[in-house]
């Protein structure tokens, strides 16, 4: 059997949010296989929903630059050693100038950035001079630019503290609709900054991932139901266990079967057929909502809109399409958070874990 180290337990705990001993036991049961341990915890209802890694360590700022004609949007992350420097006016100016430089020169990589010329010198030398003046090591960690295609539009949003930045691109069927969609895209960027979707839509989800997440969802709901049965609180009824987790699983045949079942129920209730068309769409929407809980957690289009939580982002866009008189298709979004995926120095925590194993 593989040796289960404190560092392994720490990593699994930070990735899943499960308890320390639960993580140790999961690693033991899976012979130290990290991915299998994550899935085991999820199936036991002990791990949080799978998301992108969120261990934040580095300080710094995220910057966003949207071109005046809304055809190009750039987001960048520059790291500093301390939060104090991240609030420094010179550092803030550096992030803005660098982002504008990246966009205006259509740079594609950090290596290309360091070789580019800014203010008459190589960016690499320019950054060194900034490091010498500011007094901390500074690193351009990453950046990305979205371009609008024909009849397309981009926009962006930077959260007020500069730790989260979002850029987004949409394709429209006319320049007029693209122009009208600018504010909508900015509002959707604000939603993304708040809700952090991992995917654009259910179509981007892998079926194996969906099936595994369904098992975890059922385990989580059953665990909550067990607690609700124990408490016997009339204001907290048991969760209904869904048949599916995502629209990815809802084939035409499944949707047709659900519709036929609704018709049978309406017939049994004695509802006249002439009003069925007014009832069925709402019941089908409820069926889809009940069986796409994973989408509402992880996908932009499936999430409930932060500015109107009775509608999904997809529904809000559909309403705007009618208002603007044309199609609006979100093509891509990118969200950066300062330090995302970087790890703190946690020797003390590892020692704490080791002491309890």
From Swiss-Prot:
Compartments, record wording: Cytoplasm
Main subcellular location of this protein, as a coarse class: cytoplasm
Keyword Disulfide bond attributed: no
Keywords for the protein's UniProt record, in alphabetical order: Cytoplasm, Elongation factor, Protein biosynthesis
One Pfam family named in its UniProt record: EF_TS
GO MF annotation terms: translation elongation factor activity
Transmembrane segments: none
Any one GO cellular component localisation term in the record: cytoplasm
Chain residue ranges for the region called Involved in Mg(2+) ion dislocation from EF-Tu: 82-85
Alphabetical list of InterPro entries matching this protein: EF-Ts_dimer_sf (IPR036402), Transl_elong_EFTs/EF1B (IPR001816), Transl_elong_EFTs/EF1B_dimer (IPR014039), Transl_elong_Ts_CS (IPR018101), UBA-like_sf (IPR009060)
Coiled coil: none
Function: Associates with the EF-Tu.GDP complex and induces the exchange of GDP to GTP. It remains bound to the aminoacyl-tRNA.EF-Tu.GTP complex up to the GTP hydrolysis stage on the ribosome.
Family affiliation: Belongs to the EF-Ts family.
NCBIfam families for this protein: tsf
HAMAP family: EF_Ts
Protein name: Elongation factor Ts
Protein's organism: Campylobacter jejuni subsp. jejuni serotype O:6 (strain 81116 / NCTC 11828)
Taxon lineage: Bacteria, Pseudomonadati, Campylobacterota, Epsilonproteobacteria, Campylobacterales
């Amino acid at each position: 059997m593989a040796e289960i180290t404190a560092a392994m337990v720490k990593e699994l705990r930070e990735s899943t949010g499960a308890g320390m001993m639960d993580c140790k036991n999961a690693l033991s049961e899976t012979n130290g296989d990290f991915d299998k341990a994550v899935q085991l915890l999820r199936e036991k209802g002990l791990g949080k929903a799978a998301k992108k890694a969120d261990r934040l360590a580095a300080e710094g700022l995220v910057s966003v630059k949207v071109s005046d004609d809304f055809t190009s949007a750039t987001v960048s992350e520059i790291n500093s050693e301390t939060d104090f420097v991240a609030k420094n006016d010179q550092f803030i100016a550096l992030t803005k100038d660098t982002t504008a430089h990246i966009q205006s020169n259509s740079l594609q990589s950090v290596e290309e950035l360091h070789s580019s010329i800014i203010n008459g010198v190589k960016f690499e030398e320019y950054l060194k001079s900034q490091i010498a003046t500011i007094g901390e090591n500074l690193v351009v960690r990453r950046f990305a630019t979205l371009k609008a295609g024909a009849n397309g539009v981009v926009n962006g949003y930077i959260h007020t503290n500069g730790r989260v930045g979002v850029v987004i691109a949409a394709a429209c069927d006319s320049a007029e609709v693209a122009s009208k969609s600018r504010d909508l895209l900015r509002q959707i960027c604000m939603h993304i900054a708040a809700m952090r979707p991992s995917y654009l839509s259910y179509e981007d989800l892998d079926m194996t991932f969906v099936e595994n997440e369904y098992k975890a969802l059922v385990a989580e709901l059953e665990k909550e139901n067990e607690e609700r049965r124990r408490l016997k609180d009339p204001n907290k009824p048991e969760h209904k266990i869904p048949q599916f987790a995502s629209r990815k699983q809802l084939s035409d045949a499944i949707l047709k079967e659900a519709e036929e079942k609704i018709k049978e129920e309406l017939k049994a209730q004695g509802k006249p057929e002439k009003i069925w068309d007014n009832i069925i769409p709402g019941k089908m929407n409820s069926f889809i909502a009940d069986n796409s809980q994973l989408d509402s957690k992880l996908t932009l289009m499936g999430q409930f809109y932060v500015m109107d939580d009775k509608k999904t982002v997809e529904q809000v866009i559909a309403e705007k399409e009618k208002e603007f008189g044309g199609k609006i298709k979100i093509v891509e979004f990118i969200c950066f958070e300062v330090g995302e995926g970087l790890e703190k120095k946690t020797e003390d925590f590892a020692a704490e874990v080791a002491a309890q194993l």
